[in-house]
Amino acid sequence: MIQPQTHLNVADNSGARELMCIRIIGASNRRYAHIGDVIVAVIKEAVPNMPLQRSEVIRAVIVRTCKELKRDNGMIIRYDDNAAVVIDQEGNPKGTRVFGAIARELRQLNFTKIVSLAPEVL
């Protein structure tokens, strides 16, 4: 469960290392975001000499959360960290690689480019 002021790791090579959630996109008063939700975030830590800089406001899609995700078949998935992938306005990833495992639910939410870049889909 991601809410405003939550810090997230970045799971791609876009140049950002750490994000802080500012807003959850989709509803005016939603409190929490889960896997597959799009958020507005600010870059708190960035790699030097990359296109994305610190204090830049960007959009990102959540790919991993510490809070468990329950599937319809009863399986529960939980990750060790909260992570997101930086996306542009059309929903395409800004990076060319995705690090770590991501959930299968992203494929149903039309983030197929992120799923194809991921090394492991759970």
Swiss-Prot record:
Short name of one Pfam family: Ribosomal_L14
PROSITE patterns: RIBOSOMAL_L14
Annotated GO biological process: translation
Intracellular or extracellular location(s): Plastid, Chloroplast
Residue ranges crossing the lipid bilayer per the database entry: none
Recorded name of the encoding gene: rpl14
Lineage top rank: taxon: Eukaryota
NCBIfam families on file: rplN_bact
Keywords recorded for this protein, A-Z: Chloroplast, Plastid, Ribonucleoprotein, Ribosomal protein, RNA-binding, rRNA-binding
Keyword Transport listed: no
Assembly notes: Part of the 50S ribosomal subunit.
GO cellular component: chloroplast; cytosolic large ribosomal subunit
Major site of localization recorded for this protein: plastid
Protein name from the UniProt record: Large ribosomal subunit protein uL14c
Stated family: Belongs to the universal ribosomal protein uL14 family.
GO molecular function list: large ribosomal subunit rRNA binding; structural constituent of ribosome
Provenance organism: Drimys granadensis
PANTHER family in alphabetical order: 50S/60S RIBOSOMAL PROTEIN L14/L23 (PTHR11761), LARGE RIBOSOMAL SUBUNIT PROTEIN UL14M (PTHR11761:SF3)
